[in-house]
Design a protein with these regions (language model features):
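N-terminal binding-site loop/beta-alpha segment at the start of enzyme catalytic domains
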Residues: 1-76
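Alpha-helix-loop-beta-strand connector modules within alpha/beta enzyme cores
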Residues: 61-80, 132-141, 193
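Short catalytic-loop micro-motif centered on adjacent basic/acidic residues
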Residues: 48-54, 145-149, 171-172, 248-250, ...
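Conserved, mostly hydrophobic/aromatic
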Residues: 6, 18, 35, 42, ...
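Structured C-terminal cap/extension of enzyme domains
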Residues: 47-48, 67, 166, 186-396
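Conserved residues at the C-terminal ends of beta-strands
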Residues: 19, 53-56, 112-115, 150, ...
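A short, structured active-site edge motif that brings together acidic residues
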Residues: 74-86, 112-115
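Glycine/proline-rich, positively charged
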Residues: 26-27, 40, 44, 87-204, ...
């Protein structure tokens, strides 16, 4: 395993970190046996950084129990996040943090983040509640070792956040399709210049730069036949690791095979190691990808549940597939997401435009507006009637 140094703490952090949010299982109940297998294999492969959050249903408790069963807590750097938007008074900081320690079965958090900062105003609000004194107290007591924030706002606001506090690290979304999106390359460079460790999330854009890559984009990679970069995932992860400013990237690995594949890649993907030919290949793939990337949804599920039962990520995935593959492919996926698994169709036309989903979207997608695009593409009158007839027939 390749390790990179956190400039603030001196910690040697594996270039590949384990994002635990996507552990398989029922909603809110990650499968314990699978979690044990993934975490155990990750540590065997040299991964020493695990990321979870209060707002990932059931995830902190799953990770904590797994680390205790496996006896691995002392071998990893554990990261979780404060749901700052739910903090209404200073006492809430302790209330959430103490609950997180209990869930994770630990007496300290190695890397603690303000979760999903989208504007400096969010930080200013908790500063007014006294969070700076609270952080200082927790760090002095050894219960928080490093403090940082995860970010999903504009590039300009990211620079403001960097200077708003004496941060130890930050976590940004970064991939070859997002150099000018959110913090972007400019933000990565600015954070590194300030001496912060920079952790990367969504290096494969929720899988859209890996297994879900459009065929025409994948064909560019296939034609190159690189002896080391044999999959779209390998290309995407290597592109992120090619930046020396990146301390570590998180991958939401869902089985041990993914752990093995990504760990092997992390051994070779050194900073500034990609050739001009490889970087040109990435640029050509990006050109093809952007032709079909109509809605930048990563499938994170923060928008769910919808009060009308609409499968928002599934609908956006179908919409993009209709451009990446064919209209009929997209329609089939939309049918599966909206009708096959329900007793009555949960069509995008059911949207009441309450806006609840959009308020939670890290990508700042105007979800009600984009669902209208999905409706126009997939719901001409005969199709809508067919959906409803199918559900009625099945339930009778």
């Amino acid at each position: 395993m390749q390790y990179r140094v956190d400039p603030k703490s001196g910690n040697r952090i594996s270039a590949l970190g384990l994002g635990c949010m996507r552990f398989p299982g029922a909603p809110g109940r990650p499968d314990a046996k699978t979690a044990d297998a993934i975490i155990s294999r990750a540590v065997e492969q040299g991964i020493n950084y695990l990321d979870t959050a209060y707002l990932y249903p059931g995830n902190e408790a799953c990770v904590g129990a797994s680390l205790e069963r496996l006896g691995l807590r002392d071998q990893v750097l554990l990261a979780t996040k404060l749901p700052h938007a739910s903090c209404k008074c200073a006492e809430d900081f302790d209330r959430f943090f103490d609950e997180q320690l209990r869930r994770l079965r630990t007496d300290h958090i190695d890397y603690y983040l303000m979760h999903n900062i989208t504007s400096p105003a969010q930080w200013e609000r908790v500063v007014a509640l006294g969070i700076e004194d609270w952080i200082a107290h927790q760090k002095a007591a050894g219960r928080i070792r490093q403090i940082g924030f995860s970010y999903h706002g504009s590039a300009a606001d990211f620079l403001t956040m960097l200077d708003a506090y004496d941060w130890d690290f930050c976590q940004i979304q970064y991939n070859y399709a997002g150099e000018r999106y959110q913090a972007g390359t400019a933000g990565l460079m600015a954070a590194a210049e300030r001496g912060l460790a920079v952790f990367v999330m969504e290096p494969l854009l929720g899988g859209r730069l890996a297994g879900k890559l459009p065929p025409r984009a994948r064909a560019v990679f296939d034609d190159v036949r690189d002896p080391y970069l044999k999959t779209p995932a390998a290309w995407g992860l290597s592109w992120v690791w090619n930046h020396p400013q990146v301390t570590m990237l998180l991958s939401g690995m869902t089985d041990t095979a993914q752990v093995d594949e990504n760990a092997a890649l992390a051994d070779r993907a050194l900073p500034d190691s990609m050739t001009a030919t490889q970087l040109d290949t990435i640029a050509r793939v990006l050109g093809e990808f952007e032709k079909s990337n109509r809605v930048p949804c990563t499938g994170c599920g923060y928008c769910m549940p919808c009060p009308k039962g609409i499968n928002i990520p599934g609908c956006f995935g179908a919409y993009n597939a209709s451009y990446a593959h064919s209209w009929f492919t997209g329609l089939s996926q939309y049918f599966t997401a909206s009708a096959v698994r329900t007793s009555e169709p949960k069509l995008v036309s059911n949207c009441i435009k309450c806006g609840k989903c959009a308020r939670h979207c890290p990508q700042h997608i105007d979800i009600p507006e984009r669902l209208d695009d999905v409706r126009r593409r997939f719901q001409p009158g005969p199709v809508t009637a067919a959906f409803k007839a199918f559900c009625k027939t099945r339930s009778s």
